[in-house]
UniProtKB/Swiss-Prot annotation:
GO CC annotation terms, alphabetical: cytosol
Pfam families membership: GIDA, GIDA_C_1st, SAM_GIDA_C
Lineage top rank: taxon: Bacteria
Name of the gene: mnmG
Subcellular location(s) of the protein: Cytoplasm
GO biological process assignments: tRNA methylation; tRNA wobble uridine modification
Annotated NAD(+) binding sites: 273-287
Protein name: tRNA uridine 5-carboxymethylaminomethyl modification enzyme MnmG
Organism: Haemophilus ducreyi (strain 35000HP / ATCC 700724)
Known partners and oligomeric status: Homodimer. Heterotetramer of two MnmE and two MnmG subunits.
Binding, FAD: 13-18
Protein family per UniProt: Belongs to the MnmG family.
Length: 630
C-alpha cells in the first residue's frame, strides 16, 4: 500500500540526528515525516547521560543558534551543569550537563509532537526507494510505502548492529532494540562504500549499593550556566552531584587475566572503536604503566537508582564486569543493573557525501549521524540539522547551505568527514579547528542566528532576543568608549586598586578592559563605569570582543592569508623533519607526497588545516615563502 499523503522530507530514525533533521525542515514550512521503530525512544540517550563538553558544547550552541532542540532539551533535563576550562581562554571554555534521561526524552518528544508540519509514524524502515538515481520514498516492514521528495537516513548503530558481551553476540541496534538488518542489506546494494565500526557502553550500577561516603564528590557550578541562548536557570530541575572513584592494580589484573574472553582481543569484533573513548580493556593495555584510571559515577536521573560509571566501557563477560566493578573503592558491594556491551554496526564512507550531507550517488538521499562514522550525540545532532536544512532547500529549489571551517565547528566536522573520511569513530575537539578563537561557544548566535533567520529556521521571539542582545553590546561598547578617567579624576583611586601600575595618562573604559587584570564585572563596580548590563550574554560579549580584539583580528587576517597562499610554493629542499610541531603522521605524509604548493599539501588526505598553518609559519621563519603560479 502507498500511504495517501506525500511528503517533502522523510527522516528515518528518531535519535539525536533524526530529531534535529525532522524539526529543521518542518520549521522551514515543509511537510515532514519522522519514521521510527519506537516512538517511546525518541531522543533516547543510548550511552552516557550527558550533553556538551569540550568541542561538543560548541556544537550544541551552534545547533541552538540555528533554532535546534538539543540545548533547550538539556536546560529542561540537566541535573548538573559545569563550565569546563573556566579558568582558560574563551575559545576552549565549554558547557557540559548531566541530564536526566527521562526528562530529556520527554522534552524531545514534546517538541516533536508540538511542531507544525511534522508527522510521526512508528514502523521499521526496510527499503529506500530510488528512481532514476533519486530517492523517492521508503518502504516499511509491513509493506507500507511512503513517498517523498527527499529522504534523510539517521540510523545510528542499528544498521546490521551486533551486540557483544564476552564471546557471545546477537543482532541488535542497542540493548533492547532490534537491528535494522534488512535496511542494511538494501543499502549495501547501493553504489556506496561501507565498512564497520564499533562502540561500547559500561554496565549500569545500582546506586543503593554504592558507598558514596568514601568517594570524592563532584558538584556542579555554583553559578549555574544555561545551554540555550534562550535558556533560563529557572528551567533547570533539581541539581545533584556526581562522584569519583578509580581503577587500581587489582582491577587491571582482572582485566589482563580475562583478555582471552574479550571479543576485541580474540578477533571476534572487526570494527574499530573510538580512539578518544576507549574501553577499559584498551586503557589497561595501552596505558599499563598507570596506577589507576579515574571513573566518574554519573546519576542517570532524579527518579532512578541507575548510575553510569563513565570510564569503564567494556565488552568483557558479565562475571568479569562484576569483578571489575567490585574491585573499586566504594563499589565493593555494588550490584550491576545492566551489563556493559560493545556494538558493531555499518557506516558509510563520508567521502561519498557532499558537504550538504547528500549522497553523491543518489540525489535527494541524505545521511546524518553515526552512519557517517561519527560518535557522540552532539556530532549526530549537528549533522541532522545540516541535512534537514539542505533537504528542505533542495525541495524549495534554493541554493544549498553549509558552514565553512571558519564559520562553525559544524563546518569543521563536515569538512573533515567529506574531505578526509574516517577509519574510526570521529568526534569533535577544539583542537581540530584552526580558527577556534572565532568559533567560541559564546558567539555561536552571532555567527549563525542571522543565517538561521534568512533560512526560516527561528521564530520571531528568538530573532527579537538576538537583536536586543546585539543592540546591548553595541550600546555598551560605545558607552565604555565615552567614559574617560585621567590621573586627577575623582575615580582614579578606585581604578588604581585594580590595575598593576597607577594611571599616568587618560584612558577610557575600553582601554581599561583590555588590561588582563580587569574584567567587566570589576570595571562596572567603579561608580564611573556603573551600571553593568543586566544581559549576562551581552556583557560577556563586550568583555571578550574588547579584551581579545587583537587576537580576533589576527585570526581574520589568517583566514585571508590561507586563501592567498593557495599557490604558495614549497621549496623542494624544505626539511619537514625540522618542523617539531607537526605530528609524525603528518610529517610522514608530506615527505612521501612532496607537495609543490600549500594548496596541493592541503588536499593530501590526513593533512589538516592546522598542519597547514604550522607549515606556513615555519616557511616564513626560514624565509622560504614564495608565490607562484602552478
Amino acid at each position: 500500500m502507498i500511504y495517501p499523503e506525500h511528503y517533502d522530507v522523510i527522516v528515518v530514525g528518531g535519535g539525536h540526528a533524526g530529531t534535529e533533521a525532522a524539526l529543521a525542515p518542518a520549521r522551514m514550512g515543509l511537510k515532514t515525516l519522522l519514521l521510527t521503530h519506537n516512538v517511546d525512544t525518541l531522543g533516547q540517550m543510548s550511552c552516557n547521560p550527558a550533553i556538551g563538553g569540550i568541542g561538543k558544547g560548541h556544537l550544541v550552541k551552534e545547533i541552538d543558534a540555528m533554532g535546534g532542540l538539543m540545548a533547550i532539551a538539556t536546560d529542561h533535563a540537566g541535573i548538573q551543569f559545569r563550565t569546563l576550562n573556566s579558568s582558560k581562554g574563551p575559545a576552549v571554555r565549554a558547557t557540559r550537563a548531566q541530564a536526566d534521561r527521562v526528562l530529556y526524552r520527554q522534552s524531545v518528544r514534546t517538541a516533536l509532537e508540538n511542531q507544525q508540519n511534522l508527522a510521526i509514524f512508528q514502523q521499521e524502515v526496510v527499503d529506500i526507494l530510488v528512481e532514476n538515481h533519486r530517492a523517492s520514498g521508503v518502504v516499511t516492514k509491513m509493506g507500507l510505502t511512503f513517498k517523498a521528495k527527499t529522504v534523510i537516513l539517521t540510523a545510528g548503530t542499528f544498521l546490521a548492529g551486533k551486540i557483544h558481551i564476552g564471546l557471545d553476540n546477537y543482532a541488535g541496534g542497542r540493548a533492547g532494540d532490534p537491528a535494522a538488518t534488512r535496511l542494511a542489506e538494501r543499502l549495501r546494494d547501493l553504489n556506496l562504500r561501507v565498512d564497520r565500526l564499533k562502540t561500547g557502553t559500561p554496565p549500569r550500577l545500582d546506586a543503593r549499593t554504592i558507598n558514596f561516603e568514601v568517594l570524592a564528590k563532584q558538584p556542579g557550578d555554583e553559578v549555574l550556566p544555561v545551554m540555550s541562548f534562550m535558556g533560563e536557570v529557572g528551567q533547570h530541575p533539581r541539581q545533584i552531584p556526581c562522584y569519583i572513584t578509580h581503577t587500581n592494580h587489582q582491577t587491571h589484573d582482572i582485566i589482563r587475566a580475562n583478555l582471552d574472553r574479550s571479543p576485541m582481543y580474540t578477533g571476534i569484533i572487526e570494527g574499530i572503536g573510538p580512539r578518544y573513548c576507549p574501553s577499559i580493556e584498551d586503557k589497561v593495555m595501552r596505558f599499563g604503566d598507570r596506577n589507576g584510571h579515574q571513573i566518574y559515577l554519573e546519576p542517570e536521573g532524579l527518579t532512578t537508582i541507575e548510575v553510569y560509571p563513565n570510564g569503564i566501557s567494556t565488552s568483557l563477560p558479565f562475571d568479569v564486569q562484576m569483578a571489575i566493578v567490585n574491585s573499586m573503592k566504594g563499589l565493593e558491594n555494588t550490584r550491576i543493573i545492566k551489563a556493559g556491551y560493545a556494538i558493531e554496526y555499518d557506516y558509510f564512507d563520508p567521502r561519498d557525501l557532499k558537504p550538504t550531507l547528500e549522497t553523491k550517488a543518489i540525489e535527494g538521499l541524505f545521511f546524518a549521524g553515526q552512519i557517517n562514522g561519527t560518535t557522540g550525540y552532539e556530532e549526530a545532532a549537528a549533522q541532522g540539522l545540516l541535512a534537514g536544512i539542505n533537504a528542505a532547500l533542495q525541495v524549495q529549489a534554493k541554493p544549498s547551505w553549509f558552514p565553512t571551517r571558519d564559520v562553525a565547528y559544524t563546518g569543521v566536522l563536515v569538512d573533515d568527514l567529506c574531505t578526509l573520511g574516517t577509519k574510526e569513530p570521529y568526534r569533535v575537539f577544539t583542537s581540530r579547528a584552526e580558527y577556534r578563537l572565532l568559533l567560541r561557544e559564546d558567539n555561536a548566535d552571532i555567527r549563525l542566528t542571522p543565517i538561521a533567520h534568512q533560512l526560516g529556521l527561528i521564530d520571531e521571539a528568538r530573532w527579537q532576543r538576538f537583536n536586543q542582545k546585539m543592540e546591548n553590546i553595541e550600546r555598551e561598547r560605545e558607552r565604555l568608549k565615552q567614559i574617560w578617567i585621567h590621573p586627577q579624576s575623582a575615580y582614579v583611586d578606585a581604578v588604581n586598586q585594580l590595575v598593576n601600575s597607577p594611571l599616568t595618562r587618560e584612558v577610557n573604559g575600553e582601554d581599561l578592559l583590555r588590561r588582563p587584570e580587569i574584567n567587566y564585572a570589576k570595571l562596572t563596580e567603579i561608580a564611573a563605569f556603573a551600571p553593568a548590563l543586566d544581559d549576562r550574554q551581552a556583557a560577556e560579549q563586550v568583555e571578550i570582543a574588547i579584551k581579545y580584539q587583537g587576537y580576533i583580528e589576527h585570526q581574520y587576517n589568517e583566514i585571508e592569508r590561507h586563501k592567498r597562499h593557495e599557490n604558495t610554493l614549497i621549496p623542494a629542499e624544505f626539511d619537514y623533519n625540522k618542523v617539531d610541531s607537526l605530528s609524525n603522521e603528518v610529517r610522514a605524509k608530506l615527505m612521501q607526497h612532496r607537495p609543490i604548493s600549500i594548496g596541493q599539501a592541503s588536499r593530501i588526505s590526513g593533512i589538516t588545516p592546522a598542519a597547514i598553518s604550522i607549515l606556513l609559519v615555519n616557511l616564513k621563519k626560514q624565509g622560504m615563502l614564495k608565490r607562484g603560479e602552478i
